[in-house]
Amino acid sequence: MQALLFISCGAILGASLRWAIGLLFNPLFSSFAFGALIANLLGCLIIGVLLGLFWQFPQISAEWRLFLITGFLGSLTTFSSFSSEVVELFFNDKWLNGFCVLMMHLFGCLAMTVLGIWIYKICSQLLS
């Protein structure tokens, strides 16, 4: 039951941030939901940093992992929103836009995760 509380608290914060990012960035582009891309890229960057942290300090409690990764990042990033946006573009015969959104999410998120790991490694070396 305690694990559910940690996940839920993290999810409240992640979902709230995702909503705020959507409000801020979605009006910038009419062709696709830019907020979802920003949320996914940011979430992947953060998870990269957290992976580096958890790898270096495996003694960090499982509660923090549940709160940050499962709860916060699980609700900040979402594959279902991304999928629906791409499919909607394809169904509206906006093939180029759909393909571009698909590639930006896929490669952008992978790159941000690696960047997050590198950022963590550099920061941990500078601080030690």
From Swiss-Prot:
UniProt key word Transmembrane helix: yes
Means of activity regulation: Na(+) is not transported, but it plays an essential structural role and its presence is essential for fluoride channel function.
One Gene Ontology cellular component annotation held by this UniProt entry: plasma membrane
Location(s), subcellular: Cell inner membrane
Pfam families named among the record's database cross-references: CRCB (PF02537)
Keywords: Cell inner membrane, Cell membrane, Ion channel, Ion transport, Membrane, Metal-binding, Sodium, Transmembrane, Transmembrane helix, Transport
Catalyzed reactions: fluoride(in) = fluoride(out)
Membrane topology: Multi-pass membrane protein
Record InterPro entries: FluC (IPR003691)
Entry's transmembrane regions: 5-25, 34-54, 67-87, 99-119
Gene Ontology BP, a term: cellular detoxification of fluoride
Major site of localization recorded for this protein: membrane
Residues that coordinate or bind Na(+): 74, 77
A GO molecular function held by the record: fluoride channel activity
Family, similarity comment: Belongs to the fluoride channel Fluc/FEX (TC 1.A.43) family.
Role according to the record: Fluoride-specific ion channel. Important for reducing fluoride concentration in the cell, thus reducing its toxicity.
Protein name according to UniProt: Fluoride-specific ion channel FluC
Organism: Haemophilus influenzae (strain PittEE)
Lineage: Bacteria, Pseudomonadati, Pseudomonadota, Gammaproteobacteria, Pasteurellales
Gene: fluC
